[in-house]
Amino acid sequence: MSEREERRFVEIPRESVRLMAESTGLELSDEVAALLAEDVCYRLREATQNSSQFMKHTKRRKLTVEDFNRALRWSSVEAVCGYGSQEALPMRPAREGELYFPEDREVNLVELALATNIPKGCAETAVRVHVSYLDGKGNLAPQGSVPSAVSSLTDDLLKYYHQVTRAVLGDDPQLMKVALQDLQTNSKIGALLPYFVYVVSGVKSVSHDLEQLHRLLQVARSLFRNPHLCLGPYVRCLVGSVLYCVLEPLAASINPLNDHWTLRDGAALLLSHIFWTHGDLVSGLYQHILLSLQKILADPVRPLCCHYGAVVGLHALGWKAVERVLYPHLSTYWTNLQAVLDDYSVSNAQVKADGHKVYGAILVAVERLLKMKAQAAEPNRGGPGGRGCRRLDDLPWDSLLFQESSSGGGAEPSFGSGLPLPPGGAGPEDPSLSVTLADIYRELYAFFGDSLATRFGTGQPAPTAPRPPGDKKEPAAAPDSVRKMPQLTASAIVSPHGDESPRGSGGGGPASASGPAASESRPLPRVHRARGAPRQQGPGTGTRDVFQKSRFAPRGAPHFRFIIAGRQAGRRCRGRLFQTAFPAPYGPSPASRYVQKLPMIGRTSRPARRWALSDYSLYLPL
């Protein structure tokens, strides 16, 4: 009796499971096939029992395919399609005789397409009710019309939506501030979120109006700052609208009087805020933003305003984004930017001004990269913290530059944020992580020169033994292949007594004629060292002075000579190029003598006038 009860259910043999697995390219052992056969039998019995319940609820005695599919859906399993026909499917055996498959009926597509009989609809018979009058009020909607999504909102939400949109896009700034503040704190506007996202996506239609673009970005910023909204499905749409304001050549950017640069800066900051607060809601958001910025930056056909947006966007995302995208592409991009900055034609004036904007944005981004790379490598060198150092000489720059750091790509904060970059932001496969801080600084110094605010050593580390006299340091790059910002240069010819102050009493006396032996026998303390004199050879060697000492130190008192080059302004012509040297007229004089006259350089709106004294000859405007 017990044996009959055990064999009451149908069991699937192991051979059937093994054949099904082999048909898909899998080989199963006997133990695995037995376990799978037992599990399949249990699942089939469960689905059959549930489908029989659906059959009994419909008061039928015949089990249909729809009942079985309902049982599968109830168990969160995909339904079986293709077996809902009322006719029985003919089954044909395979040649081996172990498998059966339904026979496929051949259909002639040509005859089916040219057939004149139109097949009837296979939809099920249903009854639809249309109420013409209810409570004495007529139904104005036509029969069969689909209700719109707006009709699902309440009257209060619709009224709120219209008032907020009118306040944001209106002319009253105080009302706009109140509306934006309410968008940041209101917890009952979740149903209106798709409509506000649609309003923000209208940036493409108002690209000619900077004021409207600013307001739409403020709406997006308010939505992201609202802690009660779930922005997961709408993050990509909002990011696309923000990227449009950052990267695209807006119609308002044609007029040079429109300040579209501020719009791009604000949109870049908003993009950074979106990434750090909602980047975990969308997979691959960081990679998508980086690819968009890299595509714009690598396109030479794009206008310079688009390149400016790409640079500020990378800077806003953090120094790792600058290291990964901007720094490897800088050598290629610099050639096109240099060609724009070297064009002095009148027709290129506006493009050149845009080029200077891009130059400044790149300079700020790479300086941020240098500072963060130094801070990332400093703790592993055992040096003091960056915040506790007050002077550049106290920082262990030489040990950072001349020795490779093992943690140049650690998880460090970006753009003032304490959050690390997600995995894949800057992985080990990035070639920029293998570049040391010294190599980065040398390459950037070859591009920007003294425009870099961060100062590191550009030479080799100080050896223990003295260098031979003929040993020369190779330059970082050829002077013709790089561009440096135009600046006032001063060539300082320093006497052997470089450690004495220029204003000392012995500046031109017999002490200055004593020769190099006197300066070597009586070294003075560091506080009395002149600015133009070299530093002491020691651990601090490698820090570059602004005015480097000449290799051939002449005899005599120190004197300064200023060289100014530029274009003289003219009213009826383009002006002429000039280069003028201004030596000191009366013996040695400090460089501070000309400091009060330097602001005259660059003023072209005022007429040039001569000074009362003849020795002040800095009167040529550039």
Swiss-Prot record:
Subcellular location: Nucleus
Pfam families linked: TAF (PF02969), TAF6_C (PF07571)
Residues spanning the signal sequence: none
GO CC annotations on file: extracellular exosome; histone deacetylase complex; nucleoplasm; nucleus; SAGA complex; SLIK (SAGA-like) complex; transcription factor TFIID complex
Coiled coil residues, start to end: none
Biological-process GO terms, alphabetical: chromatin remodeling; positive regulation of DNA-templated transcription; regulation of DNA repair; regulation of DNA-templated transcription; regulation of RNA splicing; regulation of somatic stem cell population maintenance; regulation of transcription by RNA polymerase II; RNA polymerase II preinitiation complex assembly
Keyword Transcription: yes
Keyword Nucleus: yes
Disulfide bond annotation, renumbered to this chain: none
Compositionally biased intervals (Low complexity): 511-522
Cited function: Functions as a component of the PCAF complex. The PCAF complex is capable of efficiently acetylating histones in a nucleosomal context. The PCAF complex could be considered as the human version of the yeast SAGA complex. With TAF5L, acts as an epigenetic regulator essential for somatic reprogramming. Regulates target genes through H3K9ac deposition and MYC recruitment which trigger MYC regulatory network to orchestrate gene expression programs to control embryonic stem cell state. Functions with MYC to activate target gene expression through RNA polymerase II pause release.
Recorded family membership: Belongs to the TAF6 family.
Name of the protein in question: TAF6-like RNA polymerase II p300/CBP-associated factor-associated factor 65 kDa subunit 6L
Organism of provenance: Homo sapiens
